[in-house]
């Protein structure tokens, strides 16, 4: 077990299996020392636990927890390419999309769920640049989607 996975276990979390792609793409790809994940939905055991727009059917607090799940799924995608999460030199960037009701403006707080998980699991290596974007709708009516870019150390 990697140190990152041990830290996740301390947080009461287990790295899930990689979420299978919903269309014609890979969950993650490596280019040089970087791994780019596809957008990760908050899938748990193959299903979305909640659907709808944040600020309407989904509360900001629920969405923040879903963003945390997205980040956990993104780490699983990184591991599928890197082989070991301890190879992460740093998280470079996080991009979060929030399916938002027309008057919802709390996207940064929602995506904090992903950012806080990465910081808790990776320490200083988890500090990153970030975008949090409100959108009208996401695939499968998911409330949140998160993608990450990480830099790896040499094996």
Where are these regions (language model features)?
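Short, polar/acidic, helix-capping and beta-turn segments at strand->helix junctions
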Residues: 1-155
């Amino acid at each position: 077990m990697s140190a990152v996975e041990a830290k996740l276990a301390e947080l009461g979390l287990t790295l899930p299996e990689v979420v299978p792609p919903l269309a014609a793409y890979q969950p993650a790809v490596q280019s040089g020392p970087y791994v780019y994940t596809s957008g990760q939905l908050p899938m748990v055991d193959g299903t979305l636990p909640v659907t709808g727009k944040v600020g309407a059917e989904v509360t900001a607090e629920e969405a923040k927890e879903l963003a945390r799940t997205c980040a956990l799924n993104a780490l699983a995608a990184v591991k599928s390419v890197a082989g070991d999460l301890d190879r992460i030199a740093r998280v470079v960037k996080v991009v979060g999309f929030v399916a938002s009701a027309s008057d919802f403006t709390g996207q940064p707080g929602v995506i904090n769920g992903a950012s806080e998980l990465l910081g808790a699991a990776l320490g200083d290596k988890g500090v990153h640049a970030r975008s949090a974007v409100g959108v009208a709708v996401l695939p499968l009516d998911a409330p949140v989607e998160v993608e990450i870019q990480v830099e790896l150390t040499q094996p």
